[in-house]
């Protein structure tokens, strides 16, 4: 999707991302050019499940026994981020980037726009029960999708008039999860899907909100990294077709029955 946008001369003024979208946004903010998109694809192609979801019998057992608040350590994900994010602090990125996380105590979305990049990204990716919460300052944060996965309201309040939404897509929602990790991702994906519909519907008359096609490969699990190339190629082709058919403008693709709009706390959080 990102490659298709850059090929069609779409250049962002700023980026907002949640969960894996935050990781991609952070990379694009540091390398906002076509070559950067190629490098990002290469990074994803080099990753395996154990690089992000390293299952450990000991950690899992501690979680099951109630001695830990997570099943998977975020140490491997931290290593991936430290190796690849091309700046140490969010404000050092070439483009402004805003990372969405969820304040664990209040349950509200928080926008991380300054401070160390890696902790902010770990917080945005901290799927509750799967990864541990991340402490920034005196507050604990978890995955931004819990509160607000596609922060369209935030983008509008920051002055955006044209917004491109790049949804990951959740084809596995049509299948029953078969393990604890799948159950956690399934629950979060359901929340995300509903909130995307609600936000676009609530703001469609306020800004030009363009939703690119979501990934739609029903046989690919969210924890399966063996189909990364297939997913990247599908996303690129579908986004390119839509952009070409609409003269460079992506088209909204929202179900008719959207949910009620959700409230969002857009207050920035400064990560020390």
Spans of features found by a protein language model:
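C-terminal helical/tail subdomains of lipid-metabolizing enzymes
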Residues: 199-272
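Short, hinge-like loop/turn segments at secondary-structure boundaries
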Residues: 31-35, 180-184, 229
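Conserved catalytic block of serine-dependent lipid acyl chemistry
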Residues: 21, 116-217, 233-236, 240
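Patatin-like phospholipase
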Residues: 1-81, 113-123, 167
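Alpha-helical membrane-targeting segments
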Residues: 51-72, 175-197, 261-265
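C-terminal domain-closing interface element
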Residues: 64-85, 210-217, 222, 226
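Short beta-strand scaffold segments in enzyme catalytic cores
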Residues: 97-102, 132
């Amino acid at each position: 999707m990102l490659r298709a946008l850059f090929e069609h001369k779409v250049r962002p003024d700023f980026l907002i991302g949640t969960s894996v979208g935050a990781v991609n946004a952070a990379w694009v903010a540091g390398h906002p050019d076509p070559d950067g998109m190629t490098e990002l694809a290469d990074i994803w192609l080099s990753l395996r499940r154990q690089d992000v979801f390293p299952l450990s019998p000991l950690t899992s057992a501690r979680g099951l026994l109630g001695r830990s608040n997570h099943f998977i350590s975020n140490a491997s994900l931290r290593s991936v981020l430290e190796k690849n994010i091309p700046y140490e602090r969010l404000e050092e990125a070439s483009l402004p980037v805003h990372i969405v996380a969820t304040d664990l105590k209040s349950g509200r979305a928080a926008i991380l726009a300054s401070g160390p990049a890696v902790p902010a990204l770990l917080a945005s990716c901290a799927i509750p029960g799967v990864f541990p919460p991340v402490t920034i300052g005196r507050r604990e944060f978890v995955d931004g999708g819990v509160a607000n996965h596609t922060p369209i309201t935030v983008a509008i309040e920051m002055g955006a008039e044209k917004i491109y939404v790049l949804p990951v897509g959740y084809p596995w929602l049509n299948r029953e999860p078969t393990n604890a990790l799948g159950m956690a991702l399934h629950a979060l994906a359901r929340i995300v899907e509903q909130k995307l519909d609600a936000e676009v519907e609530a703001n469609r008359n306020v800004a030009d909100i363009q939703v690119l096609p979501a990934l739609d490969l029903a046989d690919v699990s969210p924890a399966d990294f063996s189909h990364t190339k297939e997913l990247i190629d599908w996303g690129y082709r579908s986004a390119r077709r839509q952009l070409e058919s609409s003269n460079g403008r992506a088209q909204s693709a929202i179900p008719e029955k959207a949910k009620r709009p959700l409230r969002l706390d857009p207050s920035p959080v400064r990560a020390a």
